[in-house]
Protein backbone atom coordinates (compact mmCIF):
# COMPACT_ATOMS: atom_id res chain seq x y z
CA UNK A 1 0.00 0.00 0.00
CA UNK A 2 1.33 3.44 -0.90
CA UNK A 3 0.31 6.44 1.19
CA UNK A 4 1.05 10.08 0.36
CA UNK A 5 3.88 11.63 2.31
CA UNK A 6 2.72 14.71 4.27
CA UNK A 7 4.31 17.87 2.80
CA UNK A 8 5.74 19.00 6.13
CA UNK A 9 7.54 15.66 6.49
CA UNK A 10 8.85 15.83 2.92
CA UNK A 11 10.16 19.36 3.56
CA UNK A 12 12.06 18.11 6.63
CA UNK A 13 13.50 14.91 5.16
CA UNK A 14 15.47 16.27 2.18
CA UNK A 15 17.63 18.72 4.17
CA UNK A 16 17.97 16.22 7.01
CA UNK A 17 19.04 13.25 4.88
CA UNK A 18 21.10 14.88 2.12
CA UNK A 19 24.14 15.75 4.29
CA UNK A 20 24.11 12.23 5.76
CA UNK A 21 23.98 10.67 2.30
CA UNK A 22 26.65 13.12 1.00
CA UNK A 23 28.93 11.87 3.76
CA UNK A 24 27.98 8.23 3.12
CA UNK A 25 28.92 8.40 -0.58
CA UNK A 26 31.81 10.85 -0.21
CA UNK A 27 30.34 13.12 -2.87
CA UNK A 28 27.94 16.02 -3.30
CA UNK A 29 24.41 14.92 -4.13
CA UNK A 30 21.50 16.56 -5.94
CA UNK A 31 17.89 16.03 -7.05
CA UNK A 32 16.44 14.35 -3.98
CA UNK A 33 13.37 12.24 -4.72
CA UNK A 34 11.06 11.05 -1.96
CA UNK A 35 8.79 8.05 -2.19
CA UNK A 36 6.55 6.95 0.58
CA UNK A 37 4.96 6.06 2.77
CA UNK A 38 5.00 2.46 1.53
CA UNK A 39 3.24 0.01 3.85
CA UNK A 40 3.98 -3.71 3.68
CA UNK A 41 1.56 -6.24 5.17
CA UNK A 42 2.14 -9.73 6.63
CA UNK A 43 3.43 -12.16 4.01
CA UNK A 44 4.96 -9.39 1.86
CA UNK A 45 8.34 -9.95 0.21
CA UNK A 46 10.51 -7.56 -1.75
CA UNK A 47 12.07 -9.29 -4.74
CA UNK A 48 15.74 -8.63 -5.60
CA UNK A 49 16.06 -5.50 -7.73
CA UNK A 50 18.16 -2.43 -8.44
CA UNK A 51 16.53 0.99 -8.56
CA UNK A 52 16.36 3.33 -11.55
CA UNK A 53 19.90 4.62 -12.18
CA UNK A 54 18.78 8.08 -13.30
CA UNK A 55 17.34 8.96 -9.88
CA UNK A 56 18.17 6.47 -7.13
CA UNK A 57 21.97 6.21 -7.13
CA UNK A 58 22.45 6.83 -3.41
CA UNK A 59 19.40 6.08 -1.31
CA UNK A 60 18.05 5.60 2.16
CA UNK A 61 15.14 3.56 3.42
CA UNK A 62 13.67 5.05 6.58
CA UNK A 63 11.79 2.59 8.75
CA UNK A 64 8.88 4.62 10.11
CA UNK A 65 6.76 1.81 11.55
CA UNK A 66 7.61 -1.66 12.77
CA UNK A 67 6.70 -2.99 16.17
CA UNK A 68 9.95 -3.85 17.97
CA UNK A 69 8.33 -6.83 19.68
CA UNK A 70 7.86 -8.54 16.30
CA UNK A 71 10.56 -10.47 14.41
CA UNK A 72 12.96 -8.46 12.23
CA UNK A 73 12.27 -8.28 8.51
CA UNK A 74 15.84 -8.50 7.16
CA UNK A 75 16.97 -6.20 4.38
CA UNK A 76 19.45 -7.93 2.07
CA UNK A 77 22.11 -6.25 -0.08
CA UNK A 78 23.96 -8.28 -2.68
CA UNK A 79 27.45 -7.00 -3.50
CA UNK A 80 29.04 -7.01 -6.92
CA UNK A 81 30.80 -10.22 -5.89
CA UNK A 82 27.39 -11.89 -5.47
CA UNK A 83 27.62 -12.20 -1.69
CA UNK A 84 24.58 -11.19 0.33
CA UNK A 85 24.63 -9.23 3.57
CA UNK A 86 21.53 -8.95 5.73
CA UNK A 87 20.65 -6.06 7.99
CA UNK A 88 18.12 -5.73 10.78
CA UNK A 89 16.30 -2.50 9.98
CA UNK A 90 14.54 -1.25 13.09
CA UNK A 91 11.92 1.44 13.53
CA UNK A 92 13.46 4.91 13.47
CA UNK A 93 16.56 3.78 11.56
CA UNK A 94 17.69 4.86 8.10
CA UNK A 95 19.50 2.30 5.97
CA UNK A 96 21.78 3.94 3.35
CA UNK A 97 22.89 2.05 0.24
CA UNK A 98 23.77 2.32 -3.46
CA UNK A 99 20.30 1.53 -4.76
CA UNK A 100 20.96 1.55 -8.50
CA UNK A 101 24.15 -0.54 -8.29
CA UNK A 102 23.43 -3.15 -5.63
CA UNK A 103 20.62 -5.67 -5.76
CA UNK A 104 18.50 -5.35 -2.65
CA UNK A 105 15.53 -7.27 -1.32
CA UNK A 106 13.60 -8.57 1.65
CA UNK A 107 13.64 -12.25 0.72
CA UNK A 108 11.75 -13.57 3.74
CA UNK A 109 8.00 -13.02 4.10
CA UNK A 110 7.06 -10.32 6.61
CA UNK A 111 5.85 -12.01 9.79
CA UNK A 112 3.27 -10.26 11.95
CA UNK A 113 2.26 -6.62 11.95
CA UNK A 114 3.08 -4.07 9.29
CA UNK A 115 6.28 -2.43 8.10
CA UNK A 116 6.16 1.14 6.77
CA UNK A 117 9.02 3.00 5.12
CA UNK A 118 9.88 6.22 3.35
CA UNK A 119 12.49 6.11 0.59
CA UNK A 120 14.75 8.94 -0.53
CA UNK A 121 17.19 8.87 -3.43
CA UNK A 122 19.78 11.24 -4.84
CA UNK A 123 22.22 11.42 -7.74
CA UNK A 124 25.80 12.71 -7.54
CA UNK A 125 26.32 16.25 -8.86
CA UNK A 126 27.13 16.02 -12.58
CA UNK A 127 25.60 12.57 -12.90
CA UNK A 128 25.33 10.76 -15.32
CA UNK A 129 28.15 12.61 -17.08
CA UNK A 130 30.78 11.34 -14.67
CA UNK A 131 33.18 8.44 -15.25
CA UNK A 132 31.45 6.08 -12.81
CA UNK A 133 28.09 6.25 -14.63
CA UNK A 134 27.58 3.11 -16.68
CA UNK A 135 26.09 2.67 -20.13
CA UNK A 136 22.68 1.63 -18.73
CA UNK A 137 22.42 4.90 -16.81
CA UNK A 138 23.35 6.96 -19.86
CA UNK A 139 20.87 5.03 -22.03
CA UNK A 140 17.96 5.47 -19.60
CA UNK A 141 18.78 9.15 -19.16
CA UNK A 142 18.88 9.63 -22.95
CA UNK A 143 15.52 7.90 -23.46
CA UNK A 144 13.94 9.98 -20.70
CA UNK A 145 15.35 13.14 -22.25
CA UNK A 146 13.82 12.21 -25.61
CA UNK A 147 10.46 11.55 -23.94
CA UNK A 148 10.54 14.98 -22.29
CA UNK A 149 11.39 16.62 -25.62
CA UNK A 150 8.53 14.76 -27.32
CA UNK A 151 6.11 15.93 -24.63
CA UNK A 152 7.26 19.55 -24.95
CA UNK A 153 6.85 19.42 -28.74
CA UNK A 154 3.42 17.78 -28.45
CA UNK A 155 4.55 14.61 -30.23
CA UNK A 156 3.62 12.25 -27.39
What positions do the PLM features span?
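A structural signal for well-ordered alpha-helical scaffolds and beta->alpha junctions
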Residues: 14-18, 57, 113
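A short coil-to-beta-strand element that immediately follows conserved catalytic motifs
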Residues: 26-36
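Short secondary-structure junction/hinge motifs that connect adjacent elements
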Residues: 1-3, 34-37
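Catalytic core of non-heme Fe(II) oxygenases with the double-stranded beta-helix
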Residues: 40-102, 114-117, 123-138
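Non-heme Fe(II)/2-oxoglutarate
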Residues: 1-25
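Alpha-helix initiation and capping sites
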Residues: 11-15, 31, 50-54
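Short proline/glycine-enriched turn/loop segments at secondary-structure junctions
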Residues: 106-112
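Acidic/histidine-enriched, glycine/proline-rich intrinsically disordered or flexible terminal extensions
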Residues: 134-156
Amino acid sequence: TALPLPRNLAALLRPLMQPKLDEFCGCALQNGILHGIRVYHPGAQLLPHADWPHAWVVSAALNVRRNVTLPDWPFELRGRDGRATRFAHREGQALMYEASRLLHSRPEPLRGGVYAAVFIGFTPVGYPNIPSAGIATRAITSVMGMQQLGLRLGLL
